[in-house]
Amino acid sequence: MTKLFIFSTFLLCVWSTVVQGFSTTAKTALVIDNITGEVLLSKDIHRPIPPASMSKLMTLWMVFESLDEGKLEMHDTFKVSRKAWKKGGSKMFLREGESVKIEDLIKGVIIQSGNDACIVLAEGLAGTEENFAELMTIR
């Protein structure tokens, strides 16, 4: 009986979300159905905003794309540059000169939001952050 109650409550919550539609307090938002391409939510999508963690998501996208294409493997390593080591903000706390597995760098970006991990990945994929920024723009 308890399971039925919990399940019914869950369905009610899900159904009320579906009926009401999506909403957000975010200044801008875009939600697209991955299968149909249908825009589910569009809110002020042409408003310029700072990239913030969007560049981290794009970095991960490009890393996963390279993994899918066989250009990288999770056990491959990239060396931590001085530039990555010195980067401020949120960090994975990498040490200059150490070699870090792609798998660990991905975790550092996702869990720590590590700026240093993103720089190491960018440099490993494109040689420099600047080259990587160009690749992201092209992509």
Residues covered by each model-derived region:
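Sec-dependent signal peptide recognition
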Residues: 2-10
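N-terminal signal peptide c-region/cleavage motif recognized by signal peptidases
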Residues: 14-18
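Active-site-adjacent loops and short helices of periplasmic peptidoglycan-processing enzymes
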Residues: 19-139
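Serine/threonine-rich low-complexity intrinsically disordered regions
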Residues: 1-2, 73
